[in-house]
């Protein structure tokens, strides 16, 4: 095949009068009657030549002018071109220069794309041409804010010891019953000022009774009263004894009494 028309129509005879001109494909739109006439002439007289593009493994029967059937070889790769001959062409094939202009037109076009991203993501992705080591350094420069505080363990320990001492004193106050001061009350009653000693002995017995009943507040009050009266009885008794001794010495020191 030496021309573009043979490439486009391999089944047509080289001597056919309906060959395509020059470097163009379908030259334009044909009238319907002329187009049908071309198809009929293709099947009636087109097979008289050497059979277009040879090489296919099949054939088709074509009736010649003398009424005899003649086999014509077909090219399997060019059958679609023969099928297109049955339809009216609606397009025009241009030369290669037009395709070159189309390529230039495509090259001149610019494509714009819209990307929906956050500002932070855009800022991170824009310096793609920069050095990756500089990017890593920028990431390492990011400061992380931390909050630190110190716990003063010494004050906490002191506070804990104070609480423990208070609790221990309260426990001791509750566990240890108040003293009745019975011995001191008896001494004050017998050896000192006996009226106050008797009163101290009375409160001492009241303290022991309150402890047995479990009434510790009342027992503590009675114990304090017994201690106070016993001490007062001893003080008064001591004063009485000292006064008696002084009076006796003064009386005996006079000269008329010997």
Curated annotation (Swiss-Prot):
Query: InterPro entries of this UniProt entry?
Result: CD225/Dispanin_fam
Under Pfam families, the record lists:
CD225
Protein name, please? Synapse differentiation-inducing gene protein 1-like
Organism equals Danio rerio
What's its membrane topology?
A: Multi-pass membrane protein
- Extracellular compartment spans: 1-182, 250-258
- UniProt entry tagged with the keyword Transmembrane: yes
* Annotated GO CC locations: Golgi apparatus; intracellular membrane-bounded organelle; membrane
Query: Gene encoding this chain?
Result: syndig1l
Q: Where are the transmembrane segments?
A: 183-203, 229-249
Keyword tags: Golgi apparatus, Membrane, Transmembrane, Transmembrane helix
**Cross-referenced PANTHER family, in alphabetical order?**
SYNAPSE DIFFERENTIATION-INDUCING GENE PROTEIN 1-LIKE (PTHR14768:SF4), UPF0338 PROTEIN (PTHR14768)
Which family would the database say this protein is a member of?
Belongs to the CD225/Dispanin family.
- Entry's localization field: Membrane; Golgi apparatus, cis-Golgi network
Top-level lineage group: Eukaryota
Per the UniProt topology annotation, the Cytoplasmic ranges are 204-228
The answer to whether UniProt assigns keyword Transport to this entry is no
Primary localisation category: membrane
